[in-house]
Structures are given as C-alpha cells and as structure tokens.
Amino acid sequence: MRCRDLTRRALGAIALTALLSVSARAELPSGQQAVVRQVEAYFNGIRTLEADFRQVATDGSVATGKLLIDRNRSAMRFDYDPPSKILLIAPGDWRLIFYDGSIQQVNVIPIGETPLGFLLSEEVKLAGDVSVQAVAERPNEVDVALVRTKEPDQGKVVLTLAREPMQLRRWSVTDAQGMTTQIDLAQIRTGIELDRSLFVWRDPKLFGWPKD
C-alpha cells in the first residue's frame, strides 16, 4: 500500500507538471521571462530522453526506476524497480496507463484529463492554464514554480533545472494538503534511440498477467 500511495502521488506530480503554462508571464521581470523562454527552448530541443529516477514522498517513502520519453511518438514510460510492481506508460495515443502488478489492477486515464502535453506535445509552449508563481535563480540552478491559474490553492509544482548547460534535475509537487512528492533524475541521456516496443501496452486482461 505504501508503494502504491507513493506512486499515485507521483502520478499527480506528472499530471500537474504536464499543465505548464505562463499566463502570468507578463508580470515577471524581463530577466525571469528570459529564463522561462530558455526552459521552453530546452524542452523543445529534446526528442528522446532516458534517466534513472528516485521518488521521495513526504513520509520518506522511496521508490526508484527508469524514465523513458520519446517525444517523436508522444510516448512515456516510468518503470519502477523491484520490489515495486508498478508501471506507468503513455503509449502515444489518448491513454495514460497505470498498472499495479501487486493487485493485478489497470487504471486508464485520458491524457486530455491529466495532460502530459508538456513533455509529449509536438511543441512545448509554456502558455495556457497554469501560471508561473516564481522563478528563483541560483548560480548553478533555477527553480520555476507553477500553480493552476484558476485554482492556485490546489497545489504547486517546482521544476529545478541545472544551468549551463540547462538540464532538468528534479521536480516536486505539493498538493492542497501540503504533501510533497519529489522526483530526482540522474544519468540523463538525450537524443538516443528508443525501441518502439518499450511503449507498447499489452492489456493483461487479454494477453495474461505477467508472472513474478
């Protein structure tokens, strides 16, 4: 249960992160607006990405695994390490699929309802339904804090990127109850070949449940 709760909080983090926009950009100082444009350019320059991730919840629960993103196919995969039996996959159509092998359960969420367009859209344009709450610049990193424009009290996402060269290092999401989940990335590789089979979802109800 602990691992499943942890992963569901991460799912929320992914969904919120995907809603990035900057309808309040005009209120930012010009230097911070420039940072936002740099973040856009960084994500638009990525076609494929592979990274190890470490996920930490407010209660200290930890999970690790591998993240794969193929923006050419609008596909994503979060593969959790054992003993977790969690798989989160967006196969490149309308679905975001959450598979929990420990209880043989599959949940399908329309991407349109929990938009992953931030990472999977053809063009990353930070404009729309979420506002930049703050941009914090440090010598080697920059934080971009985001909230939902119409529901700023429902939580926030903070993206942390390295500078020179720019690279996504982590993101965290804090919900309305003050619970925070953080995802740290390591061993990041971009511009690599990713086999399309990595993003194929075979429904276990039709093809059988994987064996332990």
Listing of model-derived features with the role each one plays in the protein:
Residues 1-5:
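N-terminal secretory signal peptides that target proteins for export/translocation
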Residues 6-12, 16:
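N-terminal export leaders
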Residues 22-26:
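Sec/Tat signal peptide C-region and signal peptidase I cleavage site
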Residues 27-45:
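Short N-terminal segments immediately surrounding and downstream of signal-peptide cleavage
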Residues 41-60:
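A short, Trp-centered hydrophobic/proline-enriched beta-strand micro-motif
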Residues 46-48, 62-64, 73, 83, ...:
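Extracytoplasmic
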Residues 66-118, 181-182:
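An acidic-aromatic
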Residues 127-212:
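Gly/Pro-enriched, hydrophobic low-complexity segments
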